[in-house]
Design a protein with these regions (language model features):
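Short glycine/threonine-rich loop-to-helix capping motif typified by GTGT followed
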Residues: 52-58, 89-107, 137-148
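Charged (often Lys/Glu-rich) extended helix/loop segments that serve as interaction or gating elements
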Residues: 111, 117, 122-186
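Short secondary-structure boundary segments
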Residues: 15-17, 21-25, 103, 107-108, ...
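Active-site-proximal beta-alpha core segment in soluble small-molecule metabolic enzymes
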Residues: 1-79, 88, 115-120, 124, ...
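Flexible glycine/acidic-rich beta-alpha junction loops that bind and position SAM and/or redox cofactors
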Residues: 78-98, 128-139, 167
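Repeat-solenoid scaffold signature
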Residues: 103, 114-115
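Residue-level preference for alpha-helix termini and adjacent loops
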Residues: 15-17, 85, 134-135, 145
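Solvent-exposed, flexible loop/coil residues
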Residues: 20-22, 90, 139, 182-183
Length: 186
């Protein structure tokens, strides 16, 4: 497969994938065309922003890339993978921290899959998404020991034994229950 990188208007420039507007991308597609034992099965993209408004641009971009690749190769790849970057189930306290409504899975489908259904009514190619953390994000609990609590200009900071990967560094805090000596203090 080929991972594609193009502008979806989210303000993020990713280092991953081939920029579809460059000679490097064209060279990869030409390599596939000229190599008899290579068949392109998958075109893939992945973008960081989870906002549903970028999913229409993601789908349109992949449709444009698919059309371009198909015109060169003479076939549409078997799969188009729109990657991940989907909000999952979350508690109301967490949702409120994002400042905009959290989309449901059907909102992403409407924004992206509708365009593919219109373009490919025979249901080929297969359309994939990678929900990853959207499905697993609310399935576990982080437990750690509090090492210190301090107040800086009216804001409390808690230092725990754990990884920064377990607690957001972006100021988005997962719902918390605080226990002291086995007693819920929330």
């Amino acid at each position: 497969g080929i991972r594609c990188n193009f502008d979806v208007g989210d303000g993020v420039i990713s280092r991953f994938g081939f920029d579809t507007e460059t000679e490097d991308f064209d060279k990869v597609v030409e390599f596939v065309k000229e190599t008899s034992n290579v068949y392109l099965v998958n075109l893939q993209c992945h973008f960081a922003k989870r906002n549903v408004e970028f999913w229409g641009a993601r789908a349109k971009g992949m449709l444009d890339v698919t059309d371009r690749v198909a015109s060169i190769l003479g076939y549409v790849p078997d799969r188009i993978d729109l990657g991940g970057g989907i909000f999952g189930n979350m508690e109301k306290d967490l949702k409120r921290q994002f400042g905009s409504p959290i989309p449901e899975y059907k909102d992403y489908a409407k924004a992206a899959a509708t365009l593919f259904a219109e373009r490919f009514p025979d249901k080929k190619p297969e359309l994939l998404v990678e929900p990853g953390s959207a499905l697993a994000g609310d399935s576990m609990k982080f437990v750690g020991r509090v090492e210190s609590i301090k107040n800086v200009r009216g804001k409390q900071f808690v230092t725990m034994l754990g990884s920064q990967k377990n607690i957001s560094m972006a100021g988005i805090n997962p719902p918390m229950k605080i226990f002291k000596n086995g007693v819920n203090r929330t």
